[in-house]
Design a protein with these regions (language model features):
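Surface-exposed acidic/polar loop and edge beta-strand patches at domain peripheries
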Residues: 1-189
Length: 189
């Protein structure tokens, strides 16, 4: 069994660049593969097992935000009227669904990557995004913090491990974290 990593791979007809992780099938069948886009919020765009993609590729021209498995952070759900407070401190977000703000700030941001790894039958990739003073994303949510995800692919599976780190010693970090996978209907309804 073996695993592999290919960087700078095109995603279908979109031209988006991805990192492809794959793990060989022990029985000699098709490998398990994922494609992840660091520039699209570290979105898991594809998860293929035995030739079947379990993630919706989406309509790249009509609805490019309805694809893959976007990461939603630090506010994964609705923020009513784009306003919230935590520990008496107000936060304001630009509404993006009527008067409300949804799905956080990282889903279309560029993430930084560690060198990918392979070990026997697994391939992994660790990526992170930092909210640091001077970065535009920090201006939208001004508490220094880092979100990290590690994708690990083994035959038949993909695993995501998370780390949220508060880098600001003076205040607590309010956050929520979610993924929003778009799964296809496979087989009859």
């Amino acid at each position: 069994m073996s695993a592999s990593v290919e960087s700078d791979q095109p995603f279908r007809q979109s031209g988006w660049r991805t990192v492809r992780l794959s793990a060989a099938n022990a029985e000699g069948g098709a490998p398990t593969e994922v494609q992840i886009s660091p520039a699209l919020g570290c979105n898991l765009l594809s998860f293929v097992v035995n030739g079947t993609d379990y993630i919706v590729a989406g309509d790249l021209e009509q609805e490019p935000r309805v694809l893959g498995s976007p990461i939603l952070y630090p506010t994964p759900n609705r923020v009513h009227d784009g306003q919230m407070s935590f520990d008496g401190r107000p936060f304001a977000f630009q509404p993006n669904m009527g008067p409300h703000f949804i799905h956080g700030l990282v889903r279309d941001q560029l993430w930084q990557l560690d060198p990918p790894c392979t070990d026997g039958d697994r391939a992994c990739l660790t990526a992170r995004i930092a909210f640091a003073p001077g970065d535009p994303i920090y201006d939208l949510f001004p508490i220094a913090n880092t979100l990290q995800v590690t994708y690990t692919v083994t035959p038949g599976a993909v695993r995501m491990d998370w780390l949220v780190r508060n880098d600001d010693a003076t205040q607590r970090l309010p956050f929520g974290l979610a993924i929003h996978p778009y799964f296809p209907i496979i087989g009859p309804r």
